[in-house]
From Swiss-Prot:
GO terms for molecular function: chlorophyll binding; electron transporter, transferring electrons within the cyclic electron transport pathway of photosynthesis activity; iron ion binding; oxidoreductase activity, acting on diphenols and related substances as donors, oxygen as acceptor. It is found in: Plastid, Chloroplast thylakoid membrane. Photosystem II (PSII) is a light-driven water:plastoquinone oxidoreductase that uses light energy to abstract electrons from H(2)O, generating O(2) and a proton gradient subsequently used for ATP formation. It consists of a core antenna complex that captures photons, and an electron transfer chain that converts photonic excitation into a charge separation. The D1/D2 (PsbA/PsbD) reaction center heterodimer binds P680, the primary electron donor of PSII as well as several subsequent electron acceptors. Tyr-164 forms a radical intermediate that is referred to as redox-active TyrZ, YZ or Y-Z. C-terminally processed by CtpA; processing is essential to allow assembly of the oxygen-evolving complex and thus photosynthetic growth. GO terms for biological process: photosynthetic electron transport in photosystem II; response to herbicide. This is Photosystem II protein D1. One of its GO terms (cellular component) is chloroplast thylakoid membrane. Keywords: Calcium, Chlorophyll, Chloroplast, Chromophore, Electron transport, Herbicide resistance, Iron, Magnesium, Manganese, Membrane, Metal-binding, Oxidoreductase, Photosynthesis, Photosystem II, Plastid, Thylakoid, Transmembrane, Transmembrane helix, Transport. Residues 348-360 form a propeptide. Chlorophyll a PD1 binds at residue 201. PSII is composed of 1 copy each of membrane proteins PsbA, PsbB, PsbC, PsbD, PsbE, PsbF, PsbH, PsbI, PsbJ, PsbK, PsbL, PsbM, PsbT, PsbX, PsbY, PsbZ, Psb30/Ycf12, at least 3 peripheral proteins of the oxygen-evolving complex and a large number of cofactors. It forms dimeric complexes. It catalyses: 2 a plastoquinone + 4 hnu + 2 H2O = 2 a plastoquinol + O2. The D1/D2 heterodimer binds P680, chlorophylls that are the primary electron donor of PSII, and subsequent electron acceptors. It shares a non-heme iron and each subunit binds pheophytin, quinone, additional chlorophylls, carotenoids and lipids. D1 provides most of the ligands for the Mn4-Ca-O5 cluster of the oxygen-evolving complex (OEC). There is also a Cl(-1) ion associated with D1 and D2, which is required for oxygen evolution. The PSII complex binds additional chlorophylls, carotenoids and specific lipids. The lineage of its organism: Eukaryota, Sar, Alveolata, Dinophyceae, Gymnodiniales.
């Protein structure tokens, strides 16, 4: 009797589990969920709701750990531009700070626990989205290049939100989740690490602006060389079908136009090589930028040319590097002005003596 009941129970549960597995992994649904999606949906939903609530109503956060809280929510005198989810307090360092680690909810909010909640759930969510792209490509029999391409922004987000705060020893050094907070993070990053003079950042700039240029060039060339398959009074869109085997544009005509516009070997005559280049250029550049931020997280900073060129009378002839250094010092003085009086560069007596001729 006991074995009969167990067999009936197993027969009732197995079909339901198999139905759930087939529903999760099927590619026939309007939106593919996948096993990674089972992790992506709750984490991204949690991060989104926590961010919205924190941006609207979070109390001020003691970001510097000196009992001088900074407000970031709309209910505390901020607007869309100045509002942000403030990073966790410097008093927390890189400690994991969930709600149950605080004595009360007020203490958790005061120490910026909202920031860790949003960032960690967001990080898990985007990594799950990355895995979901691979999973869908695998089930459709596609190559995994979409997954590889999306790894670039995931690497950049990981460098800014995870690697850099850990390298600096505190999540208070992470990027605030807001518009003005992002710009503040960029200025402070330049002041402390001289990122503009870092070769890996230069690759990233070339990737972003170059990728935008190549995308605009490719899109305009394709649109200008579409093969017309309809009559004059019909829309050109009626001549194409999704998934058709024939080309929709004349790559030879586009190649000839661009070759005559610049020079012959400046354009691609192979569609696969062209699109691989369009995908690889920005992806590799963003990878290198993420590597640069990760190295600067451990203070392997950009190139710094400290020695000025002196004329015959001993007066310095300032170069662009000197102007950049002076700007960095100014930005660093304004950063955390209540936490310390001077940045480390100005707290050194030798540095002050070396800067004295420039001041004079």
């Amino acid at each position: 009797m006991k074995s009969t009941l167990l067999n009936k129970k197993s027969q009732q549960t197995t079909p339901a589990w198999e139905f759930f597995c087939s529903w999760v992994t099927t590619t026939e649904n309007r939106l593919y969920l996948g096993w990674f999606g089972c992790l992506m949906v709750p984490t991204l939903v949690s991060a989104t709701f926590a961010y919205i609530i924190g941006f609207l109503a979070a109390p001020p956060v003691d970001i510097d750990g000196i009992r001088e809280p900074v407000s970031g929510s709309l209910l505390y005198a901020n607007n869309i531009i100045s509002g942000a989810v403030i990073p966790s307090s410097n008093a927390m360092g890189v400690h994991f700070y969930p709600i149950w680690e605080a004595a009360s909810l007020d203490e958790w909010l005061y120490n910026g626990g909202t920031y860790q909640l949003v960032v960690f759930h967001f990080f898990i969510g985007v990594c799950s989205y990355l895995g979901r792209e691979w999973e869908l490509s695998y089930r459709l029999g596609m190559r995994p290049w979409i997954f590889v391409a999306f790894s670039a922004p995931v690497a950049a987000a990981s460098a800014v939100f995870i690697v850099y705060p850990i390298g600096q020893g505190s999540f208070s050094d992470g990027m605030p989740l807001g518009i003005s907070g992002t710009f503040n993070f960029m200025l402070v990053f330049q002041a402390e690490h001289n990122i503009l003079m870092h070769p890996l950042h230069m690759f990233g700039v070339a990737a972003v602006f170059g990728g935008s240029l190549f995308s605009a060039m490719h899109g305009s060339l394709v649109t200008s060389s579409l093969l017309k398959e309809t009559a004059e009074f019909e829309s050109a869109n009626y001549g194409y079908r999704f998934g058709q085997s024939t080309e929709t544009y004349n790559i030879v005509a586009a190649h000839g136009y661009f070759g005559r516009l610049i020079f012959q070997y400046a354009s691609f005559n192979n569609s696969r090589s062209l699109h691989f280049f369009l995908g690889a250029w920005p992806v590799v550049g963003i990878w290198l930028t993420a590597m640069g931020v990760s190295t600067m997280a451990f203070n392997l900073n950009g190139l710094n040319f400290q020695q000025s060129i002196l004329d015959a009378s001993g007066c310095p002839i300032n170069t662009w590097a000197d102007i950049l250094n002076r700007a960095n010092l100014g930005m660093e003085v304004m950063h955390e002005r209540n936490a310390h009086n001077f940045p480390l560069d100005l707290a050194c007596a030798n540095c002050l003596l070396s800067l004295w001729p420039m001041v004079g």
